[in-house]
Amino acid sequence: MSFLTSMFKTEKPVIGMLHLRPLPGDPLYYPGGSVSQVVEAAKRDLEALQRGGVDGILITNELSMPYEQHVSPSTLASMGYVIGALSHDLSTPWGAEAIYDGDATIELCAAVDAQFTRCNFCGAWAGDL
């Protein structure tokens, strides 16, 4: 049995993407917003994904645009906070990604005990955006 099959309990897992709303420090962060609003939106999305039957969940800062090759400390701190707030509600294998920053992704995943990740780490900076 492969590592992925043992983690997800299926040979072809469906991994749902939980895109966090813009975080503090992001250009698109809502004026007058709060991290608790980001947490509440993430909880709603998490519930919908798990209810929908996904085999795993990847939590990302997809809306931290424009993407940077080095994620800011405020983004990492905010992601860690939001993931901590979601941790008791996660019932499927889950991972995290700090978009386009492999080092920050590994640091974040180690800090929050993520079970897997996806990241750009090999020096190829190509994408669809």
Name each model-derived stretch:
Residues 46, 83, 105-106:
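Generic hydrophobic/aromatic pocket-lining and core-packing "Φ" positions
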Residues 10-11, 16-17, 68-96:
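Alpha-helix-loop-beta-strand connector modules within alpha/beta enzyme cores
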Residues 19-44, 94-101:
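Active-site mouth loops of central-metabolism enzymes
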Residues 50-78, 123-129:
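Glycine-rich, proline-tolerant flexible connector loops at the mouths of alpha/beta enzymes
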Residues 20-23, 104, 108-129:
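Conserved anion-binding
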Residues 86-87, 93-96, 100, 108-110, ...:
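Ligand-binding beta-strand-loop-alpha-helix segment within the catalytic cores
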Residues 14-18, 57-59, 94-97, 117-119:
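Hydrophobic faces of well-ordered beta-strands that scaffold small-molecule active sites
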Residues 47-50, 109-110:
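Non-catalytic positions within long, well-ordered alpha-helices that form the structural scaffold/packing
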